[in-house]
Regions:
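Cytosolic juxtamembrane N-terminal segment immediately preceding the first transmembrane helix
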Residues: 1-37
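Extracytoplasmic gate region of multi-pass secondary transporters
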Residues: 42-43, 233-290
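Interfacial helix-cap and linker-helix signal at transmembrane-aqueous boundaries
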Residues: 49-50, 81-82, 166-174, 264-265, ...
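Helix-breaking motifs and short loop linkers at transmembrane-helix boundaries and internal kinks
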Residues: 54, 86, 107-113, 141, ...
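Conserved MFS/SLC helix-loop-helix module at the cytosolic interface between two early adjacent transmembrane helices
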Residues: 73-109
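Cytoplasmic membrane-interface "Motif A"-like loop-to-helix N-cap segments
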Residues: 84-94, 299-310
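Cytoplasmic helix-loop-helix junction between adjacent transmembrane helices
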Residues: 117-154
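Helix-loop-helix hairpin linking two adjacent transmembrane segments in secondary transporters
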Residues: 152, 156-195
């Protein structure tokens, strides 16, 4: 690259950054919205699928479990691929994969066909969270990073709401297959991203540094990215801490999201219609909370707000369980929803700023998705307590997980260790 070319490239980066990252944000927001819709479709279509294929409860549950396994694999591979091939390319590839295979689910003729295709599609769906957040963290200025990434995460929550509305309209009128046929529509977002958004400058510079090292007289041996992470004492320590924190966060979140509606309905005796209204209200306040948390985290720091959201959730959940009445449960749920929505708004920024560009995708994807294994056991844990007592007892275990999740980074992980807009 000549000096003149370098100057022109630098000018392009400084003149158009806002236009580029705004375009990237809109497309990534819609991609995560589609991701949230697709993931939620399984829950809403499960009863219809179970009836059509004459499935047992165990077989029906296996669809969700294998989807989760696929998501973990996708997150691990996707994080590595982001560092190896580029953030934009990975999002494009996995979006096409997920949309194509999810659409194919509308044509399956057996349970095993559905299980296999859904598991592979989940690999694509699982990678998009890491890839989109990594891309945006490297485009958005530090001053606004948490606010923008928090707004990005509202797309996923909004996707769950959209899935509720779409399933309620489509399944009674057209059947569950139509639900999956329409998942081909978001594939257009992949092509728009490919043509409108270039790879982040920090990733391009990081790759160029590696090429220069390879071209030098010193022979550079390619290493497994996980080996690179574990070899460095500081990277290894932060990586292991985030695995523990992410595991506790997803353990608590999975347990609450799966069992909270059942708790309201069975333990508190709330009607299904009223329970649905409470959950919609909770989702809406979560969206608001994510935006507020992002703004406050940019102003006061990621560490403090993440601890407040996670530990606040942990401390407020017993209040919901032990001090609810028919007249105050709505207000308690809204206050709980605000705290419950905060951690995921800050988590992505906090994690991406904990690692350098050269290993960011691998480290964040690895920590988050190894931690996701904890989510597999959360519904079973609450089910165990519910079998011998009440769902509320199991929810208290989730509160403990949230407290641990916030305590670990509060004690050991500093704010803004690395700037995602720099090569390293």
């Amino acid at each position: 690259m000549t000096y003149e070319t370098s100057v022109l490239e630098a000018e392009r980066v400084t003149v158009q950054p806002k236009k580029i990252w705004m375009t990237a944000f809109i497309l990534c927001f819609l991609i995560l919205l589609a991701d949230g819709v697709d993931l939620a479709f399984l829950a809403y279509s499960l009863t219809s699928i179970k009836a059509e294929f004459n499935l047992t409860t165990v077989q029906a549950g296996a669809l969700g479990s294998w989807s989760l396994v696929g998501g973990v694999i996708g997150g691990l591979i996707g994080g590595w691929a982001c560092d190896r091939f580029g953030r934009v390319k990975v999002i494009v590839f996995y979006m096409i994969l997920a949309s194509s295979l999810s659409c194919t689910l509308g044509f399956v003729e057996s349970y095993h066909q559905f299980l296999i295709i859904r598991s592979i599609a989940a690999i694509g769906l699982g990678s998009l969270y890491i890839a989109c957040n990594t891309l945006m963290s490297e485009y958005v200025p530090t001053k606004y990073r948490t606010t923008v990434l928090a707004a990005l995460m509202t797309g996923f929550t909004l996707g769950s709401l959209c899935a509720t509305l779409l399933a309620g309209w489509i399944i009674p009128e057209y059947g569950w297959r139509m639900l999956y046929w329409i998942t081909i529509c978001p594939i257009v977002l992949a092509f728009l991203l490919y043509f409108l958004v270039p790879e982040p400058d920090s990733w391009l510079r990081s790759r160029e540094l590696k090429r220069q090292e390879a071209a030098s007289k010193v022979k550079v041996k390619k290493e497994n990215p996980y080996k690179v992470i574990l070899k460095d004492k500081n990277h290894r320590w932060i990586f292991l801490l985030w695995i523990l924190s992410a595991g506790a966060l997803q353990f608590g979140y999975a347990g609450l999201s799966n069992w909270l509606p059942a708790y309201l309905e069975s333990d508190l005796g709330i009607s299904f219609k009223a329970m649905t209204g409470y959950m919609v209200g909770t989702f809406m306040i979560m969206i608001f909370a994510k935006i507020v948390a992002g703004i406050l985290a940019d102003r006061f720091g990621r560490r403090a707000l993440f601890a407040f959201g996670t530990m606040g959730t942990a401390l407020f959940l017993p209040i919901v369980i032990y001090f609810n009445t028919p007249t105050n449960i709505l207000y308690l749920m809204l206050m709980f929803g605000f705290l419950y929505g905060m951690p995921f708004a800050i988590n992505a920024t906090y994690m991406t700023e904990s690692f350098p560009t050269s290993i960011r995708g691998t480290a964040v994807g690895g920590a988050f998705n190894i931690g996701r294994i904890g989510a597999v056991f959360a519904p079973l844990t609450i089910g165990y307590f519910a079998h011998g007592g009440s769902i509320g007892t199991g929810l208290l275990v989730m509160a403990g997980a949230y407290f641990i999740c916030g305590l670990i980074p509060a004690l050991f992980i500093r704010d803004r260790l690395y700037d995602p807009q720099k090569a390293d």
